[in-house]
Amino acid sequence: MSSKLVLVLNCGSSSLKFAIIDATNGEEHISGLAECFHLPEARIKWKVDGGKQEAALGAGAAHSEALNFIVNTILAQKPALSAQLTAIGHRIVHGGEKFTSSVIVTEDVIQGIKDSIPFAPLHNPAHLIGIAEALKSFPNLADKNVAVFDTAFHQTMPEESYLYALPYSLYKDHGIRRYGAHGTSHFYVSQEAAKILNKPLEELNVITCHLGNGGSVTAVRNGKCVDTSMGLTPLEGLVMGTRSGDLDPAIIFHLHDAMGMSVDQINTLLTKESGLLGLTEVTSDCRYVEDNYATKADAKRAMDVFCHRLAKYIGSYTALMDGRLDAVVFTGGIGENAAMVRELTLDKLGLLGFEIDHERNMAARFGKSGTITKDSSRLALVIPTNEELVIAQDAARLTA
C-alpha cells in the first residue's frame, strides 16, 4: 500500500501541534508543539529523524509565527517529505449545527467556521489562521485541505443532554444548544480503551477526561457520546487554564449592573482571565499548581477547585452508564502528566470503588499509558491522545 502523508495542524487556544503522518500506518515523520503563545517564553519543539530540536519563537509569538517557522524552517529542511504530502488536515473545535462530520475545506466551509466563532472565540479564529497559512504555503494542495470537527463525536447526544432549559425557539431558530468539544480526542481514547479492555467499541461504557488548557469530560455509553461537559461554547464545564467553566449565569448580570463591566470585558474575564489563572492570580499553567501545591496557598486553592469540579462531573456521569462503568480514562496534557490531579480526583470517588496505585500513577506520565488504580479497584487508565492520527485518517479518506 502506498503511503498517504498528511500534514496535520491542530491550532489550540495557546498552542499549535503539528505532524506529518502516514495515514495508512500511523507513522509520524515529523511532529512538534509550539506553545506558550502570547508569553515571553513562546517556543517550538519538534522531532524529525529521531532527533529532537527546539527554538524560541520570540516573545509574544502566536499561531502565525509558529506556522511560518514550520513551513520556512522545519519543512524547508525536508523538501522530499513536503513533496509527498497528499492532504492537510485541520482540527476545528466548533462546527455549530452545520457540520456533523469531516469535510473538504471550501469557501462555504470557511464561512461556516467563521459563523461559529461566537461559539468558540478562542479557537475558531486560530483554526482559520491555520487554514489560510496552509492554502498560502501549499497551493498544490488547495483542494486537499480537510476540516475535522471536535463537535462531530458529540452529535449522538440525546435531546435531554444537548438542550438547555430555555425557550425551545432559541434552539430551533438560532441553534442554541450544547455541542461539546474535544470530540476527536474523546473518540480516539474510547477506541483505545476498547482495545485495552478487549471489548467491541459498541459495548464500551467509559468516562473520558480530556484535560489540557481546555478540558472536558464525556460520558461514552455503548461506544457513543451521551453527554459531555462543554456546551454551546468551550466555556462551559470544568475549571480550565483561563476559562471559568460552570458558573451562576446571574454573575454576568452582577458584573455588568453592579460593577459596571462591559459585555466585552466580561467575555475577556470569563475566557482569558479565569480558571487556574484567575484562582492563582499568577499563571494558567497546571505545572505551577502541581509543583507548588504543598507550599503556596494560591496553588492549593486552584488545584482543589479544579479537582473538585472534575470529580463532580465524573460522579454525575456514572448515572448515565446503565449500571456498568468499564473505566475512567485520563488524557490531554494535564490528564496524561499531572499525576496529582488524577490522584486527588480519584480520591474523591472512593464511593465508586476507585483506589489509586501511587507507583502506577507516577509511572503513567510523559507519553506512557497504563492502569493507575490497584488491581482490586474500579479501573482508571491513562491513554495519551492522538487526535492527529484521527485527523490524518479522515483527511486521507476524504481526499482519496
UniProtKB/Swiss-Prot annotation:
InterPro entries: Ac/propionate_kinase (IPR004372), Aliphatic_acid_kin_short-chain (IPR000890), Aliphatic_acid_kinase_CS (IPR023865), ATPase_NBD (IPR043129). ATP binds at residues 17, 210-214, 285-287, 333-337. It comes from the Bacteria. The active site is at 150 (proton donor/acceptor). One of its GO terms (biological process) is acetyl-CoA biosynthetic process. Its EC number is 2.7.2.1. GO terms for cellular component: cytosol. Its main location: cytoplasm. Pathway: Metabolic intermediate biosynthesis; acetyl-CoA biosynthesis; acetyl-CoA from acetate: step 1/2. It is an enzyme of class 2 (transferase). Pfam families: Acetate_kinase. Mg(2+) binds at residues 10, 387. This is Acetate kinase. It comes from Yersinia pestis. The lineage of its organism: Bacteria, Pseudomonadati, Pseudomonadota, Gammaproteobacteria, Enterobacterales.
